[in-house]
């Protein structure tokens, strides 16, 4: 335990740096003085905050819960992606690391699913798959504004899955869980629909949020 704790704290450092970089890029977007200025920092504000900061924290929490050594590669890859994004290295390298990190996060959920086939895990897996889809689109040079529905679905479904997990203690029926799963599928489909029609994607995402 004494050995594991410093290791986990080390993995938190890139996430904390991603938060600071995200706040720095927010100042740049507002046209205010910022401690750090680079050519691409303001352009990657969204991915820094969602993929690098929140993604690292969520992946680390999942890795700790899973317990396997390879699960820690997910937060490590996401944190490394953040460090590379702020370095002179090509952004493509950072994007590749983030894609790998979310691919591993999906693998973590799949591994847990084999042992515990629960609806809340399915919802969280949909969230991780949304992040992976968004990261792949970012790697394919899709503009960041078009990634917003994917990043939103990642956070919404992750939080929804955790809420379903916590509420299981007070429920005697599975119907609310099943309802949450079908709503999660709607939210999961919305970003893909937004690639075809931004308006309809927003409408479907809004309906999904109302359903929650």
Task: Name each model feature, range by range.
Residues 1-212:
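Hydrophobic alpha-helical transmembrane segments of multi-pass integral membrane proteins
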